[in-house]
């Protein structure tokens, strides 16, 4: 999101100011909410989360899972950082850069707005929505080559195979599908029309999770459990040897 101005000397301030315009534009972005969305995976995820969550949020999760048209429930979920991304696309400012000298009126100001796009919503659709929100205050451009895709269907054969594999290493563990506000190589496969699912046989405690750290590692038991998990999962999906 960027703004531009002729600039000038700070001793001669004017009403039009690139930084002020950007601030006003970001205030509008902050207030904007994408339309509520859902799919089979998120409804199953929120139903189970609601059963395990108490209070107002737990009630909202259960209500939304039962009726995703429940606007009041969606509003409560939107206030939860942990779950808002399971009900809609989110956009948030993450970086700012503006001005070129401490004693000069800014000629430009730029903000990076990071969007996590809900499967089924198009990248250009989000850009146009943000441009409509900021109006003439700023210009909204895409950075990089972002992609979007439709969600993969919640296939019963995949759920059955994953459940079997999980219970092979952790008997009695409930298996609940979920959607995360991130991305993986699965995005490329889904965009090509190939149903894709992220699964893992790695179980660990919170204090054993060093993901993306310099000391990223698995416990020894998790390594061997994962080998068994993948063997069961792949052989189930591939079928018997012929």
Over which residues does each language-model region extend?
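Hydrophobic residues positioned within well-ordered beta-strands of beta-sheet architectures
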Residues: 111-113
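A short core secondary-structure module
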Residues: 11-35
